[in-house]
Design a protein with these regions (language model features):
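Conserved HGGG/HGGXW glycine-rich cap/lid loop of the alpha/beta-hydrolase fold
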Residues: 11-65
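Conserved alpha/beta-hydrolase "acid-adjacent" motif
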Residues: 219-225
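Catalytic active-site module of serine/aspartate enzymes centered on a nucleophile-bearing elbow/loop
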Residues: 235-276
Length: 276
C-alpha cells in the first residue's frame, strides 16, 4: 500500500493505493465523518484477489485538509474530488463505490461524469426513504456541533489522544469523534444544503453495471432505498447483507461478491463486430 496526495482547488487530499497488480481501478469511499480507515479490510481483501483499490479521504475527513466553509462540503463537490483523483492517477475510467455518503458521491459522479465511470458498488445508499431518519439524526448533531462547541472541543481533543486499535473500522469511528466541532458542523451543513442524490431521471440514465449492497432494520439506510435504486439503475443487481457490519466484521462472503463483480466487469468482451 502506498500513500499519496494531490491538490484540488487549493486543498490537499490524501489517498491510499492498494496495487493488487491490476491497472484497473476501484475507488472506494468512506461514509459521513469517517475516513479511509473504514475500508482498509475491504481494500486488503480485494488487492489479494488481484484488484487495484484506491481509498480517498474526502475533504474534511481523515488526513485531508479540513476547512470550515460549508460550501466546500457539498456532495457534488465531493464528486469533483473523485474525478480529480482519477486525473491525478492518470486513470481514464474506474469503478466507483463506497458506503453511505461514499455511495451517494459515486452516484453523483456517475451522473455528472459518465465517461469516467466503468461501474458502481453502492453500499447502503441514502435515498428518499431515509430523509426523515437522517433529519432526526443529523440536525441534532449539527445543532450540538454549533452550540456545544466548548464541550465538543474538549471531547474531540481527548479522543484524538486515545491510542488506535488493530481494528481499522473502529479507528475510523474514533477519528470521526476526534473531528473539531467547527469541521463537523461545516461538513454536516454542506452535505445537507446541497443535492444529496441524482434525480430519478438521472439515475435511470446511469447505464454502467452496478452492485447495490443493502440490509434491513436500518432507518438511515433503509432497504427500500437500495431496492428502489437497484430497480432504477438499468444494469444493477441487489445483494442483501446479513447485517450493517458484515462487510467489516465478517467480510468473506461479500468481498467474494465484490471480487466476482469486478472480475466480470473488466473481463474481455467477445468481439461482436466480426462477420460470418
Amino acid at each position: 500500500m502506498k500513500t499519496g496526495s494531490f491538490e484540488h482547488r487549493g486543498r490537499r487530499l490524501v489517498y491510499d493505493d492498494y496495487d493488487g497488480g491490476s491497472s484497473r481501478v476501484l475507488v472506494y469511499l468512506h461514509g459521513l465523518l469517517l475516513d479511509a480507515e473504514l475500508n482498509r479490510g475491504i481494500a486488503d481483501a480485494l488487492a489479494a484477489q488481484g484488484h487495484r483499490v484506491v481509498l480517498l479521504d474526502l475533504l474534511g475527513h481523515g488526513r485531508s485538509d479540513a476547512p470550515t466553509h460549508a460550501s466546500e462540503y457539498r456532495i457534488d463537490s465531493y464528486a469533483e474530488q473523485v474525478v480529480a483523483l482519477l486525473d491525478h492517477l492518470g486513470v481514464d475510467r474506474a469503478v466507483l463505490g463506497g458506503l453511505s455518503l461514499g455511495a451517494n458521491v459515486s452516484l453523483v459522479a456517475a451522473a455528472e461524469h459518465p465517461e469516467r465511470v466503468r461501474g458502481l458498488i453502492l453500499e447502503m445508499p441514502v435515498m428518499e426513504w431515509a430523509v426523515p431518519a437522517a433529519a432526526m439524526a443529523f440536525v441534532p448533531m449539527l445543532l450540538a456541533a454549533h452550540y456545544g462547541r466548548p464541550l465538543l472541543r474538549i471531547t474531540s481533543s481527548l479522543m484524538s489522544r486515545v491510542p488506535r486499535t488493530p481494528l481499522s473500522a473502529l479507528n475510523s469511528v474514533m477519528d470521526a469523534a476526534s473531528l473539531s466541532p467547527e469541521v463537523m458542523s461545516s461538513i454536516l451543513h454542506g452535505v445537507l444544503v446541497g443535492p444529496v442524490v441524482p434525480t430519478t431521471e438521472q439515475r435511470e440514465g446511469i447505464g454502467v453495471p452496478a452492485l447495490v449492497l443493502a440490509h434491513t432494520h436500518d432507518l438511515i439506510h433503509p432497504f427500500n432505498d437500495a431496492r428502489n435504486l437497484a430497480e432504477q439503475l438499468p444494469a444493477a443487481r441487489l445483494v442483501r447483507a446479513h447485517s450493517p457490519l458484515e462487510l467489516r466484521l465478517q467480510p468473506e462472503r461479500l468481498t467474494r461478491e465484490l471480487g466476482d463483480f469486478l472480475a466480470e466487469l473488466w473481463a474481455p468482451r467477445p468481439d461482436v463486430s466480426s462477420s460470418d
